[in-house]
Amino acid sequence: MRSFRRSLLILCGVLAIVAADLLPAAAQTRGGTLRVGQARSPVSLDPALGLSLHEFHVLFSIYDGLVGYDDNLALKPALAESWQRTDPRTYIFKLRKGVKFHDGTDFDAAAVKWNVERILDPATKARVRDLDVVEAVEAVDSHTVRFRLKTATGLLPAFLAERGGLMVSPAAAKRLGPDFGRSPVGTGPYRFVEWMTDDHITLERFDQYWDKGAAHLDRVIYRIIPDESVLVTNLRGGQVDYVADVPPKDLAALKRETALAVQQRPGLGFYWINLNSGVAPLSNRAVRQALALAVDRPAMLRSLYFGAGVPAAGPIAPSSWAFEGPAREQPRDLARAKQKLAEGGVPNGFTFKLLVGSTPMYRTNATAVQAQLAEIGVTVELEIAETVKVLQQVVARTYQASSTVWIGLNPDPDFVLHPLYHSQGLFNKDRYRNPKVDELVDRARTLDRQDERRKLYQEAAALIADDAADLWLYHPDVTAAMSRKVHGVPLSADGRVRLRGAWLEK
């Protein structure tokens, strides 16, 4: 029954997208201004420096990657027409010819070499760490690039579909220096015009774009509207045409609006309680398992997130090609939870502090977990702080637990298992260590075949879940709502807005 229900939920998500696309046929037109509403402003439009999902909504219009994604998040050629792994530590990329940056300079192998070396240069202070695997990059000829890697990995094409592969104009970046993130120059379908802080970002069509069928709009305006209620009101009133990340409480009402279309599908991320397994008693596996058994995930999903997602029993989402299936589901069991507390040496419960940032959903989840854990004698003291302070404590490892979200942006399981659960992972701030997990993830990184990698990731994810490394709560759906005049904007499981092919019905 659970397997059927999970399959049905995923099917319904896909059908929601199909339904949004089954609109009366309209002739594709050129021109017009698409107004995209989003709740947060980017920090930087330099792909090497930013971090947030909302930046990607803009970045993917300004820049192209060496590698791209199709609508199902399978890798496809972009600025690189093809690539070949010639040995375990070497890749050859053949580049697309005739591509121009928005400033009129040529995109070629020298530009790729400069971009990669810029990210690897410590002086750049890039937040992109995926390309640390690169030992050297060489321009073989004007449109051929060779990557030599420090270790064998089959993941380089996936890395180059993300921030590290978004190509910036070397000439513009050198000229603008630290101001480049406010005046970005790429090769994408739309070029930067202006950025009014906390108000809007304007782009216009790049008429020399190499993919002639991709840029139909005259302009794109990203309007920054921090209040979600105001954002939804603007969509209903026609002040914006498209909104990603629709508040779950508004989905049902928006679906009833005849002038709007709503897209919804399972996502790749998860809301979670990040546990610091380096401090007692959370360092005890049985204690962490007790907490996992005491959480009522389906109830939280229904009451807090209006059912817009699926319960989480581990870090790999159902929309991932490495998802193991309903066997990983974990029902609530208070009796077993209390037994596990006794096994962990705290039969009467214990107290721990839970860091909570300023995002409302973090607080809502934390309050629910606090009430549920109280039923097994565990006292959760909420420590409310600004998100920046929370991050500082997490980085310094001076915390016991934190309520947060992992935004799944890349469909490859390595992008969650390695940074969060490998002992050398970039974001493994909770001191989780399992040598077998390290071994499995390291082995999967060396392989090319997805079926071989899937087995290794599933085994690693099962170990992580059995260790109760964290409290995964639920995988939220990705959503979008738009005027029915908007066409050609697919919704992928990563939730990032891609406007190649977007057009407005007149």
Regions found by a protein language model. Give the residues of each.
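Surface-exposed binding/hinge segments that line
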Residues: 29, 84, 94, 128-172, ...
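N-terminal lobe/hinge region of extracytoplasmic solute-binding protein
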Residues: 37-87, 114-117, 185
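Gly/Pro-rich hinge or "lid" segments in bacterial periplasmic/extracellular proteins
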Residues: 74, 161-215, 219, 227-229, ...
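Extracytoplasmic/peripheral linker and loop segments enriched in polar/acidic and small residues
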Residues: 92, 379-390, 415-484, 506
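Ligand/substrate-recognition segments at binding pockets and active sites
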Residues: 197, 320-321, 342-409, 450, ...
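Append "and occasionally in soluble cytosolic enzymes with long acidic Gly/Pro-rich linkers
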Residues: 205, 256, 263, 282-371, ...
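Ligand-site clamp/hinge motif
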Residues: 207-253, 370-371, 379-381
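Long beta-strand-rich cores associated with HINT superfamily self-processing modules
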Residues: 480-506
